[in-house]
Design a protein with these regions (language model features):
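Non-catalytic, conserved peripheral segments adjacent to functional cores
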Residues: 1-107, 125-127, 134-182
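Conserved SET/PR-domain catalytic core that frames the SAM/AdoMet-binding pocket
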Residues: 104-121
Length: 182
């Protein structure tokens, strides 16, 4: 695996190194030792799959607060997404900055999202599937979110948002979230 730092402290793009032959290829997509060598959280508590039927579907921006903060490893296994993370760690040099990248099934690139980051994505194709590996179990009482179009972050989505859940649409602006600790 090839680990590439993003502009956000602690977040990485991870590319596979396929070994191919006449059968196809073999590639490692997770290795505890390699994650530890790069200072990444190697714990695996839960894996999730998100199927998104329509292009323009938005999910996010989600995170969990302590003591249930989670790191995520995100990969698009069918279709394509525009993936976005926001650094919400107050002691970070990249606090409130965001990073985005297109992830597709074709290139198999993954995004490592550290604890304390909000995460979300917009589907770029119909029938898009996303696979997540999480370092922590889902804890409803620790779940938080900010709106995908919150002006505090200035995220530019590459296409119109056509489908978004009521929950994701109703998240408050960042300032009220920060003041409430939510």
């Amino acid at each position: 695996m090839i680990f590439t730092k993003t502009p956000l402290e602690g977040a990485f793009l991870i590319d596979l190194e396929p070994i191919g032959d006449e059968r196809g290829f073999f590639a490692r997509s997770f290795c505890r030792r390699e994650f530890e060598a790069h200072g990444l959280n190697p714990d695996l508590a839960q894996c999730n799959i998100s199927l998104n039927l329509r292009r323009g579907t938005l999910r996010g921006m989600h995170w969990q607060v302590a003591p249930h903060q989670e790191a995520k490893l995100v990969r698009c296994t069918r279709g394509a997404i525009h993936d976005v993370i926001i650094d919400l760690r107050q002691d970070s040099s990249t606090f409130t900055a965001h990073f985005s990248v297109d992830l597709t099934a074709a290139h198999r690139r993954m995004l490592y999202v550290p604890e304390g980051f909000a995460h979300g994505f917009l589907t770029l194709e119909d029938d898009t599937e996303v696979f997540y590996q999480m370092s922590e179990f889902f804890a409803p009482d620790a779940a938080r979110g900010v709106r995908y179009d919150d002006p505090a972050f200035g995220i530019r989505w590459p296409r119109e948002v056509l489908v978004v859940s009521d929950r994701d649409q109703s998240y408050p602006d960042w300032e009220p979230v920060a003041e409430r600790g939510r």
